[in-house]
From Swiss-Prot:
It comes from the Bacteria. This is Glycine cleavage system H protein. It comes from Saccharophagus degradans (strain 2-40 / ATCC 43961 / DSM 17024). Pfam families: GCV_H. The modification N6-lipoyllysine is found at residue 65. GO terms for biological process: glycine decarboxylation via glycine cleavage system. Binds 1 lipoyl cofactor covalently.
Amino acid sequence: MSELRSELKYLESHEWARVEEDGTVTIGITDHAQEALGDVVFVEVPEVGSQVSIGEEAGVVESVKAASDIYSPVSGEVIAVNEALEDAPETVNSSPYDDGWFFKVKPDDLDELEKALSMEDYKAAIESDD
């Protein structure tokens, strides 16, 4: 069973979002997603200073099996990207919720995350897919 964390919000497209103490949002892909993808070999993230929109493509993750778009769970300005993934994309496999995060956003409206799934709802969604 994939690891899930109760403090995160989830998208059905398998991204997670964590609201930080300063109100920014950190985004990555779920443990379930990295397991399905297999060995991650490349991650493309948006540029710092760029704008992302809720539900819109914000990047790409590539594995030995497939390439998958990354969608943003909130609209806002990208304020940081995980540059370590450029040299070590496999970190997404070993630490999807910690060291394997993709980018951070200063959200235009934090209430947009209300549209995301709780851990329980995401768990039900992935179990119905299996």
